[in-house]
Structures are given as C-alpha cells and as structure tokens.
Amino acid sequence: MNVDEAIRDLLNISTDIRSVAVLGPEGETIACGPGTASSGLAAAADRLWEAASASAAAADAAALDHIVVQDVAGAVAVLQADGRRIVALTGAQPAVGLLLFDLRTCLSDAFVEEDPA
C-alpha cells in the first residue's frame, strides 16, 4: 500500500476527518487530501508541534507522540511515528481515541514497505 492508498482508506473509515496530510522527516508534505485546507496543513502542524514540544520540554515532560487541539467546531490532531507526522482536521466532536488509532494505522500502512520485517 502506498501513502495515497493509505489516505484513501483512512478517509473511507474515519468519517470525522475532513482533511489530512502526511509529512516527511523535514516537515514536507508527502501527500494530502481532500479540501483546500490540505495545502496549509504542513506549516500549521509544524508550528503547533514545535510550540507543544517546547512547552513539554520546559515542563520536563516526556517527548510528545501526538497532540490534539479541540474546540466546538472540530479538532486538529498531529501524530508522530518513525520520523513522520500525520495531521488531520475533523468535524465537531470527534472520537479522539479512535481518531488517533486511525491516524497511527494510516501512517503505518503508508510506509509498510519501508519498515524492517
């Protein structure tokens, strides 16, 4: 499965997600879809991640593997694994635990051929 197929599967199973982007190790967009918000997701996710990481470091907290910012209109979720990040925008009241599971699965599926056996 490639990254575009993994995103397509994610969007088919997770009805909460409105837009998603997969980011590479340098924060570059590898793939995204759908919607006009996708093009700006990488930069926004990078700024959000850096701010949250700095806050965690200042508090001597553990390194982050995900962040979720939620309000009445929806949520932004960023998850990091194996040097890559995935960011999603959702509609109102997403099931956050399921959302994070789906994002982790998408990221894993997108790069399954690169992972050591």
Q: Residue locations for each model-derived region?
A:
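Non-catalytic interaction/Regulatory regions outside core domains
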Residues: M1-P25, T29-A117
